Swiss-Prot record:
Pfam families: YgfZ_barrel. Folate binds at W27, W189. It comes from the Bacteria. Its main location: cytoplasm. This is tRNA-modifying protein YgfZ. InterPro entries: GcvT/YgfZ_C, tRNA-modifying_YgfZ, YgfZ/GcvT, YgfZ/GcvT_CS, YgfZ_barrel. GO terms for biological process: iron-sulfur cluster assembly; RNA modification; tRNA processing. GO terms for molecular function: folic acid binding. Belongs to the tRNA-modifying YgfZ family. One of its GO terms (cellular component) is cytoplasm. It is found in: Cytoplasm. Folate-binding protein involved in regulating the level of ATP-DnaA and in the modification of some tRNAs. It is probably a key factor in regulatory networks that act via tRNA modification, such as initiation of chromosomal replication.
Length: 326
């Protein structure tokens, strides 16, 4: 029996989100297994996976030789290897790049479409899951395994959980929360990631940015002490020579349409508007507010005013839940 996804509805902000079960169809799961899996993935991503415990998950970037990100990966350990979650739109291209040198190692790299990705967020999310699972993750143990399920804990923008599970458990959870929880699609999780300042790399922006342009260093996603990995020289240069002049920003406001990933924005300069930045993700909330995640210059004034191109409405900067000060 397959897992049936949920119909779309406008997402809510974390502050107003009722208990919600979210089908994460826009994200995809992949795995690397085999005796060389740790050594191999260590040579491909920005984070130091050798230091990662069974109870941790982390965000890392997979870069090209120029240090530009193919994608960001939410990594965690699994059996004799690792699993990761990324945007479905970049899955195929990212796996193709990751497999390029796999012929020289004892590893198997593959997408995993058998399992289901679900999010649980909103009012009393922990209490709802406690009725289903014997143990839940928290700030100290961010990853918990329970039977066929792996549960990942997220702190921002408010406590939420990501479940990697089988179809039977996904259907059981949907049934148990029926009538108690709202059901929504990937847009709700996307809205929460945007609020949390977690970079969203879709196909339109793959190969465009170094990790620091999306604040990955502030999210613990870059190790400057580990050994070589693809793109390391350019990522290190950006830090030690101050070559990175960009950052990820959260904007909120109104617009007559939801812009696409890859579009630019316009910055108000006196009476005029100047094109700036690149949109990573955007979504419209149920109260009409537009949330936009964009890469722009890292020296913007906090009071800067923006707009979707040629739109009559405006957007403003919203503080992120972490600091970029090093």
């Amino acid at each position: 029996m397959a897992f049936i996804s949920f119909p779309p509805r406008h997402p809510s902000s974390s502050a107003r989100l009722p208990l919600t079960l979210i089908a994460l169809d826009d994200w995809a799961l992949s795995t690397i297994t085999g005796v060389d899996s740790e050594k191999y993935i260590q040579g491909q991503v920005t984070a130091d996976v050798s230091q990662m415990t069974e109870q941790q998950h982390l965000l890392a970037a997979h870069c090209d030789a120029k240090g530009k990100m193919w994608s960001t990966l939410r990594l965690f350990r699994e059996r004799d290897g690792f699993a990761w979650i990324e945007r479905r739109s970049v899955l195929e291209a990212q796996l193709t790049e990751l497999k390029k040198y796999a012929v020289f190692s004892k590893v198997v790299i593959a997408p995993d479409d058998e399992r289901v990705l679900l999010g649980v967020a909103g009012f009393q999310a922990r209490a709802a899951l406690a009725n289903v699972f014997s143990e839940l993750p928290n700030s100290e143990n961010q990853v918990v395994r329970d039977g066929a399920s792996t549960l990942l804990w997220f702190e921002h923008p408010a406590e939420r959980f990501l479940l990697v599970t089988d179809v039977a458990t996904a259907n059981m959870l949907t049934e148990k929360l029926h009538g108690e929880a709202e059901l929504n699609n990937s847009q709700q999780w996307l809205a929460l990631d945007i609020e949390a300042g977690i970079p969203v790399i879709d196909a339109a922006n793959s190969g465009q940015f170094i990790p620091q342009a999306t604040n990955l260093q502030a999210l613990g996603g870059i190790s400057f002490k580990k050994g070589c990995y693809t793109g390391q020289e350019m990522v290190a240069r950006a830090k030690f020579r101050g070559a990175n002049k960009r950052a990820l920003w959260l904007l909120a406001g109104k617009a007559s349409r939801v812009p696409e990933a890859g579009e630019d924005l316009e910055l108000q300069m006196g009476e005029n508007w100047r094109r700036t930045g690149a949109i990573l993700a955007a979504t419209q909330l149920d109260d009409g507010q537009l949330l936009v995640q964009a890469v722009m210059n890292n020296d913007l004034e906090a009071e800067s005013v923006f707009r979707v191109r040629d739109d009559a409405n405006t957007l403003h900067i919203v503080p992120l839940p972490y600091s970029l000060e090093e």
